[in-house]
Amino acid sequence: MSNVLLSPNGYVFASPKPLGRFINSKSGGRKLFFSVVRASSDDADCNAEECAPEKEVGTVSMEWLAGEKTKVVGTFPPRKPRGWTGYVEKDTAGQTNVYSIEPAVYVAESAISSGTAGSSADGAENTAAIVAGIALIAVAAASSILLQVGKDAPTRPKAVDYSGPSLSYYINKFKPSEIVQPSTPSVTEAPPVAELETSLPETPSVAQQETSLPETMASEAQPEASSVPTTSSTS
């Protein structure tokens, strides 16, 4: 069996004899033949500086969009032969990493779409035609509604001339008669203050009664005094 040394870019095949015998042997007459086979490097898998994407770090590349001449219909993310897609990022060691996060592009097969992947302006003609058709239908519907409303509009009634009496005649006719009440004379009553003032001059009569009391008492005392001497004389 032969010993095999693996390298990142190729394979190294030693001589048919074991490698240990070559190291331990002291004879210098033997010759060793080494054959180096380098593996083919794919451009899409290389990580060298010349193959690194020339993209701005921290942004998402937009090369996953459909090309102008793409003829594939449906969900298909077209890409160029050496296109770099995804999120470009550099790590702390300075190595550029590309993450494949591109979304799938869907080409709708409808009347608005052009039916093929490409720029968004390809289906603008169909979109404009559909919008114009919808606008014409809306205008026709609005005009028909206005015509129907104009036909069904009610006619205005004709004015009739009035030949009867005026309104003031009926107002005076049905106006109720006014009720006249006779005026009653107002009775004036003397205020009580005047009665008090008229009763004040009568108060001197009380003083006259008081002055008459001593006179009556004196007149009563005189007959008693006159009666006493008469009794003594008779005795």
From Swiss-Prot:
Q: Name one GO biological process term.
A: regulation of protein complex stability
Q: Where in the cell is it found?
A: Plastid, Chloroplast thylakoid membrane
Q: What are the record's GO terms for cellular component?
A: chloroplast; chloroplast thylakoid membrane; plasma membrane; thylakoid
Locate the transmembrane regions by residue number: 127-147
Listed A to Z, the keywords are: Chloroplast, Membrane, Plastid, Stress response, Thylakoid, Transmembrane, Transmembrane helix
Q: Which domain of life is it from?
A: Eukaryota
Membrane topology for this entry? Single-pass membrane protein
| Summary of subunit composition and partner proteins | Interacts with psbA, psbB, psbC and psbD.
The record's section on PANTHER family has: PROTEIN MAINTENANCE OF PSII UNDER HIGH LIGHT 1
The name of this protein is: Protein MAINTENANCE OF PSII UNDER HIGH LIGHT 1
What organism is recorded for this protein?
A: Arabidopsis thaliana
